[in-house]
Curated annotation (Swiss-Prot):
Family membership: Belongs to the ATP-dependent AMP-binding enzyme family.
Membrane side Cytoplasmic: residue ranges: 33-683
Protein name according to UniProt: Long-chain-fatty-acid--CoA ligase 5
Organism from which the protein derives: Rattus norvegicus
Residues passing through the membrane, by range: 12-32
Intracellular or extracellular location(s): Mitochondrion; Endoplasmic reticulum; Mitochondrion outer membrane; Endoplasmic reticulum membrane
Enzymatic class: ligase
């Protein structure tokens, strides 16, 4: 006892006392700085709630009242921007840069003033502040695009984006369909194309072209000869300043934009979206983020997704409503990493195609067994933290493994949202582990403005698209031909709410095909309610066909499964009603193919590998293996493939501006190879 008493109460030696104090301080600092988990806000086993008529709403929504707006002073896109001007205290708004230079910024007031001057110019030229006044915007993402769009909203006009790569014939169709008499475009090359169409009497209604970039007198004279007035954007703004008109803002129910969706077949369809459609979708997004992420004037996003995407425009609207900043990429996707490092965005909207490239590059750089082991261990360890609600980027694994990836995206991303196409489980899991920020997957289409569902904070499982957002309900309807029935929690995804469009411009027949008498939008996608109340996309109603034996084929579903194959960049699955099997066209990934081929003992250039029969056989076997793992039936598996070295792209006419396959064009482009594949198998 005496020994214990002496040990406890005798003075400690100075070194021991210092060690004890140091240890105690370290424990105290760890306790107050340890990462705090963010707990789920809803029951993750019951993420959506059934309502009358078989529809469902998100569980975070307290009742069946659908949201119309988030801020009472921002019910139109004009008011959204004015709110941003106020809350930012006229802070920086739109940023741009030249190669190897920092971003330069235009303030909110400068943007607002320039929009008013441009709009005043249009009124001075005789254009009306009317719902029937459609203004074409034909440009790549840049500050002037936003200024032109805001000019429309400031004077109750309607913006009609003419997508950069919509195609010459589609541009003519849209201009005529929407009776567009004025187009604001970026380059002399586009202006020349517009003038040529007028010279050929293909777009007789076009009267004015306003050009963002400098142009010469020859172009102006050429325009004058065919009745086109050519104006520089600078001159148009000066003219509007001299003949200023007070803003004539729209009402929430007024049209804001006609977004022509470039279909995979047929002519583009003009989806009519109101200010209320877009603002309600923005409001639902802000409501969803409210408990975990509140955008501020300090937030910045990068604009690189085509402004053909309503997804991109929705994110921009959210940023504007909170006074944040938008920086534009230089126009070359290859320079995007450099732009990201210079801009350091905090909000990053993205698409699986880009994330797949980053993921594949990281995987390919882990060449040795030790590097692969460390990478996989880092992913598992970090993702375990994420599953426990810990979102951070200051862990040991961040310093050792993930800091380079984070830095390549600017190093300050707080929020990532992926949409426009399905994302694979490994890729989504990787980014949730690697980025140390909130990463969500959203689902929607232009006809419901942008998004109708999104994954929930705290649910870090993959393979689904979350639950309905608070501006719409979702239900599943029977598709008997494909054996999908709502009683089995399967069917066509239908959406009803404040974000659902008003129909297609001058096309009541197409409108009735997708918008029923009760206001439900029929998406053409097949979904399944999972036991936890989340929505999973399982099939596609459109673009289906029958094989000779009567089996229905949904090629997009098969392509989504095959996209998980490591050596694959793109795949096109083709079938015909007089054939009993499928064939495919495969574009390998240039970064993954060499290592894939090396495993079977084949080396060579990318083009040589694409022509090698052993490589072709190995790719086909890998596709069939991935297909079997993905649950494809035997008749859904391709029997042969053609390996093509050049990617499908917007430029070669094989993808739409929203990066969807143009199936008719692909079949025409590869008709010789398709015929050869069928003949070789039938022999």
């Amino acid at each position: 006892m005496l020994f214990i008493f002496n040990f406890l109460f005798s003075p400690l030696p100075t070194p021991a006392l210092i060690c004890l104090l140091t240890f105690g301080t370290a424990i105290f600092l760890w306790l107050i700085n340890r990462p705090q988990p963010v707990l789920p806000l809803i029951d993750l086993d019951n993420q959506s709630v059934g309502i009358e008529g078989g529809a469902r709403r998100g569980a975070f929504q307290k009742n069946n009242d659908l949201i119309l707006y988030y801020f009472s002073d921002a019910k139109t896109l004009y008011e959204v921007f004015q709110r941003g001007l106020a809350v930012s205290d006229n802070g920086p708004c739109l940023g741009y840069r030249k190669p190897n230079q920092p971003y330069k910024w235009i303030s909110y007031k400068q943007v607002s003033d320039r929009a008013e001057y441009l709009g005043s110019c249009l009124l001075h030229k005789g254009y009306k502040p009317s719902q029937d006044q459609f203004i074409g915007i034909f440009a790549q993402n840049r500050p002037e695009w936003v200024i032109s769009e805001l000019a429309c909203y400031t004077y109750s006009m309607v913006a009609v984006p003419l997508y950069d790569t919509l195609g010459a014939e589609a541009i003519i169709y849209v201009i005529n369909r929407a009776d567009i008499s004025v187009v604001i475009c970026d380059t002399p090359q586009k202006a020349t194309m517009l003038i040529e169409n007028v010279e050929k009497d293909l777009t007789p209604g076009l009267k004015t072209v306003i050009l963002m970039d400098p142009f010469d007198d020859d172009l102006m004279k050429r325009g004058e000869k065919c009745g086109i007035e050519m104006l520089s954007l600078h001159d148009a703004e000066n003219l509007g300043k001299e003949n200023f008109k007070k803003p004539m803002p729209p009402n929430p129910e007024d049209l804001s934009v006609i977004c022509f969706t470039s279909g995979t077949t047929g002519d583009p369809k003009g989806a009519m979206l109101t200010h209320q459609n877009i603002v309600s979708n923005m409001a639902a997004f802000l409501k969803f983020l409210e408990p975990i992420f509140q955008p501020t004037p300090e937030d910045v996003t990068i604009s690189y997704l085509p402004l053909a995407h309503m997804f991109e425009r929705l994110v921009q609207g959210v940023i504007f409503s909170c006074g944040g900043k938008i920086g534009f990429f230089q126009g070359d996707i290859r320079l995007l990493p450099d732009d990201m490092k210079a801009l350091k965005p905090t909000v990053f909207p993205t698409v699986p195609r880009l994330l797949n490239r980053v993921y594949d590059k990281v995987q390919n750089e882990a060449k040795t067994p030790l590097k692969k082991f460390l990478l996989n261990l880092a992913i598992i360890s970090k993702f375990n933290e994420v599953r426990n609600g810990i979102i951070r980027r200051n862990s040991l694994w961040d310093k050792l493994v993930f800091s380079k990836i984070q830095s390549s995206l600017g190093g300050k991303v707080r929020l990532m949202i992926t949409g426009a196409a399905p994302i694979s489980t490994p890729v989504l899991t990787f980014f949730r582990a690697a980025m140390g920020c909130w990463v969500f997957e959203a689902y929607g289409q232009t006809e419901c403005t942008a998004g109708c569902s999104i994954t929930s904070p705290g649910d870090w499982t993959a393979g689904h698209v979350g639950t309905p957002v608070s501006c719409n309900f979702v239900k599943l309807e029977d598709v008997a031909d494909m054996n999908y029935f709502s009683v089995n929690n399967e069917g066509e995804i239908c959406i009803k709410g404040n974000n659902v469009f008003k129909g297609y411009l001058k096309d009541p027949e197409k409108t009735q095909e997708v918008l029923d008498k009760d206001g439900w939008l029929h998406t053409g996608d097949i979904g399944r309610w999972l036991p936890n109340g989340t929505l999973k996309i399982i099939d596609r109603k459109k673009n289906i066909f029958k094989l000779a034996q009567g089996e229905y084929i949904a090629p997009e579903k098969i392509e989504n499964v095959y996209s998980r194959s490591r050596p694959i960049l793109q795949v096109f699955v083709h079938g015909e009603s007089l054939r009993s099997f499928l064939i495919g066209v495969v574009v390998p990934d240039p970064e993954s193919l060499p290592s894939f081929a090396a495993k079977i003992g084949v080396k060579g250039s990318f083009e040589e590998l694409c022509q090698n029969q052993c490589v072709k056989k190995a790719i086909l076997e890998d596709l069939q293996k991935v297909g079997k793992e993905g649950g494809l039936k035997s008749f859904e598996q391709v029997k042969s493939i053609f390996v093509h070295p050049e990617p499908f792209s917007i430029e070669n006419g094989l993808l739409t501006p929203t990066l969807k396959a143009k199936r008719v064009e692909l079949a025409k482009f590869f008709q010789t190879q398709i015929k050869s594949l069928y003949e070789s198998i039938e022999e």
